[in-house]
Amino acid sequence: EAYIKRLEELEAIAKDQPGVVEAHAFQAGREVRVVLQAEDTTDAQAWDASRAIAKEVEERLTFPGEIKVTVVREVKAETLAR
């Protein structure tokens, strides 16, 4: 139960950042991956978000070792050829 709560807390911290579409905790809470809205954010904002999330995790959670924060900002373009 504590394990699930920790994962949910990690995801909640990440989702509090502006522009976040998705956040998922992995690796027994050792990593959190965050997806930003590509249209509304810049590369610099992605870096800022990763630092802000890491800082918030350090301040709000107690954990042994490290937690890796990965922020993804991508654009997908799809077209059908017929």
Regions found by a protein language model. Give the residues of each.
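Divalent metal-dependent catalytic cores for phosphoryl transfer on phosphate-bearing substrates
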Residues: 1-30
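Interdomain boundary/hinge elements
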Residues: 3, 63-70
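Residue-level signature of catalytic and energy-coupling elements of molecular machines
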Residues: 14, 34, 69
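Intrinsically disordered or highly flexible coil/loop and linker segments, enriched in small
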Residues: 20-23, 62-66
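Flexible glycine-/small-residue-rich
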Residues: 27, 36-38, 71-73
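A short interface-forming secondary-structure element
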Residues: 32-46
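Short, non-transmembrane amphipathic alpha-helical segments
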Residues: 46-62
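Short, low-order "capping/linker" segments at domain edges
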Residues: 75-82
